[in-house]
Amino acid sequence: MKGNKGLYCPMLEHDNCGIGAVVNIKGKKTHQVVSQALEIVENLEHRAGKDAEGKTGDGVGILLQISHRFFKKVCLKEQILIGDDREYGIGMFFFPADELTRNQSRKMFETIVAKEGLRFLGWRKVPVHEDVLGKKARDCMPYIMQGFIEKPSDTAKGLEFDRRLYAIRREFEQSSTETYIVSLSGRTIVYKGMFLVGQLRTFFEDLQDPDYQTAIAMVHSRFSTNTEPSWNRAHPNRFIVHNG
């Protein structure tokens, strides 16, 4: 048997994260894509870290296309007028639990949106089931909201609009260190958190709604090796996932 080369010892290797994707190659949006992607991540427990009690995960998440059918329905209930498909962008926010700080952050974001020449449409509190979480995840759980921004008529759909949203996000990040923008785009949205693999589906009500339809879904289960788990550090990271 050959010995170790240098300082490398294969016995000290660690597992890394789990990743997966589901794509409808014809571009047809269905809820089946959401369900299949969630099923993938639920089968990646061997690629997902958790605490010693086995009740809090290192992080699990999913990236999806924005489902106009779904958001038109839920925004109508909130009296948020989002317009036609791809005529708006959505931000997913992890706000502080403290109400005063949260309201200050929201006001700051709305001010920056107006400063950049865009119109803010409204806020939606994301419905969640925090009772499925382990104590550690629940104790540091953020206040999760979605913010809606109208696409200006002089800005093209897709990448051009996303570039303007990117500038807004970067400016906001310089002004607020206590709020984390999970995603901000006119095309995609990220749902993630400090979950076990089976908690992503049950935590977010949005993911269980048959009207949430997408042609693309990417999932990630995190296995922390050199950084502590947190809500922010869960993947996907707005555009990509990686397994270390």
Regions found by a protein language model. Give the residues of each.
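N-terminal segments that mediate ammonia production and transfer
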Residues: 1-243
